[in-house]
Regions:
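Charge-rich, low-complexity segments
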Residues: 1-96
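C-terminal accessory nucleic-acid interaction domains of nucleic acid-metabolism proteins
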Residues: 1-27, 37, 41-42, 98-118, ...
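A short beta-strand motif that forms the metal-chelation/ATP-contact edge
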Residues: 162-169, 213-217
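Short beta-strand
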Residues: 48-51, 152-158, 203-207
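Signature for HUH/AEP ssDNA processing cores
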Residues: 83-158, 168-180, 292
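A generic structural signal for beta-strand entry/edge sites
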Residues: 69, 81-83, 116-118, 161, ...
Length: 292
């Protein structure tokens, strides 16, 4: 694909590192496609676009727009206008061509927007909390999920938080509704809050967070999204939402170390999420244990 304005700066240089251009973003999408596509392909995807870079106007595109690139697949979500999805490297580059800096897919089964295939717990710290507090919180969520017979994975968000993500089975006997998916995430989050009310809150309002980690379970309903693993972030520092092993989640972890300046070295390392889909388990026993 021929890029228009390939030298357009999308992220300014930082700490002696050069600016990141549209051509650089396209090269990243090409290099990381094998890691990104399993998490976005055939899923309705919202895109954060910044055609003039992160210093210009930024907007959230949910639906296909007139003249959408033919490399993007249209996904029917029973709405007036379909969503789009990148199903191959050409689709990812097309998103980059349009100034698409962030990928936020539904947590649904590929090809079936009505069936959830994962649960995301978004750990969002109050201003002033240390990242080590987020690390400790992620370990609490991990233990809770494992106690329920499920397998949690973890990633940076490209910002100040962490996501704990749980793959679930979608076969005919195991699949659950969006309502069940969200109810489970809420029940687990509330249980964690009750056990440690001084550390966690499930209240969205900023004023209620005072020194606590917000357990955001709201990313688990129909049409809700979460930033994809390996997605860039439209923020200073050109961070990437980076999949981690649990062994990496320890004191000293620096989420800003995963960015578009060093992705080549990151891609040479084994994928900590290579077993994400094979770790799926039915959510139904855990729902029963939570009284749902």
């Amino acid at each position: 694909m021929t890029l228009s304005s390939p030298d357009k700066v999308l992220w300014p240089g930082r700490e002696g590192r050069p600016p990141i251009t549209k051509a650089d973003l396209a090269r990243y999408y090409e290099a990381a496609a094998e890691r990104i596509l399993p998490h976005v392909g055939e899923r309705p995807t919202s895109i954060i676009r910044a055609p003039d870079g992160i210093g210009g106007e930024t907007f959230f595109q949910r639906h296909a727009m007139a003249g959408s690139n033919p490399r993007l697949k249209l996904i029917d979500v029973k709405a007036r206008t379909p969503y789009v999805s990148a199903v191959d490297v050409g689709g990812l580059v097309a998103i980059g061509q349009s100034g698409g800096l962030e990928l936020h897919p539904w947590g649904c089964k590929p090809g079936d927007p009505e069936v959830p295939d994962q649960i995301t717990f978004d750990l969002d710290p109050d201003e002033g909390l240390d990242f080590n507090d987020v690390i400790a919180a992620a370990k609490v969520v991990r233990r809770k999920i494992e106690d329920l017979g499920l397998t949690p994975f973890v990633k940076t968000t490209g910002g100040k938080g962490l996501h704990v993500v749980v793959p679930i089975r979608t076969d005919a006997r195991s699949r659950v509704s969006w309502e069940q998916n969200k109810a489970f995430a809420k029940a687990v989050s509330e249980a964690i809050r009750v056990e440690a009310p001084d550390r966690f809150t499930t209240t969205l309002a900023k004023k209620a967070r005072g020194g606590k980690i917000f357990l955001d379970y709201l990313r688990n309903g129909r049409m809700a999204t979460a930033v994809a693993p390996w997605s860039p972030r439209a923020r200073p520092g050109a961070g990437v939402a980076f999949p981690l092993s649990w062994g990496q989640v320890k004191a000293g972890l620096d989420p800003s170390a995963f960015n578009l300046w060093n992705y080549e070295a990151l891609l040479k390392k084994p994928d900590p999420w290579k077993d994400f889909r094979t770790a799926e388990a039915s959510l139904k026993p855990a729902l029963k244990r939570m009284g749902l």
